[in-house]
């Protein structure tokens, strides 16, 4: 696959996220994809990744990745890298790492969001997601959860 094709697929992926088009989102990942998020163990498999994506939308129903245009978007070989503005409002329940419910704060967040993805046969096989989790939690008035 060409770098240009991978860049187009990356935009399609974020379009699917923003539209909550989970069928397209799933089709752009290999079944055995590995996804790394800040402050959690890697997610293995598209079914688990789709569940966590749907969960995130329940906690932040208006979350959005600004990908038209991206702040940064480039490719090298099988890899793509994107940086986008990521926004949302905490309107639903979150579950902390200990399994406790965190009620909605109704606070907004805005952070840069970076995705570094490796593509094979038009699908992501490895996805690394980076964003300022501490900054996000501060904006949501949830810094006490970081201690």
Language-model segments: which ranges?
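C-terminal and inter-domain tail/linker signature
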Residues: 1-147
């Amino acid at each position: 696959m060409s770098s240009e094709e991978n860049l187009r697929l990356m935009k399609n992926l974020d379009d699917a996220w923003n539209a909550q088009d989970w069928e397209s989102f799933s089709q752009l990942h290999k079944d055995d994809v590995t996804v790394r998020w800040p402050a959690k163990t890697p997610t293995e498999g598209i079914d688990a990744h789709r569940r966590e994506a749907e969960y995130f939308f329940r906690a932040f129903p208006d979350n959005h990745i600004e990908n038209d245009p991206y702040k940064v978007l480039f490719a090298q070989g099988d890899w793509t890298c994107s940086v986008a503005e990521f926004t949302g409002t905490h309107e639903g329940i979150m579950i902390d790492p200990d399994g406790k419910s965190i009620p909605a704060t109704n606070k907004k967040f805005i952070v840069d969001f970076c995705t570094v993805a490796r593509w094979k046969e038009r699908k992501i096989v490895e996805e690394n997601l980076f964003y300022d989790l501490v900054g996000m939690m501060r904006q949501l008035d949830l810094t006490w959860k970081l201690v």
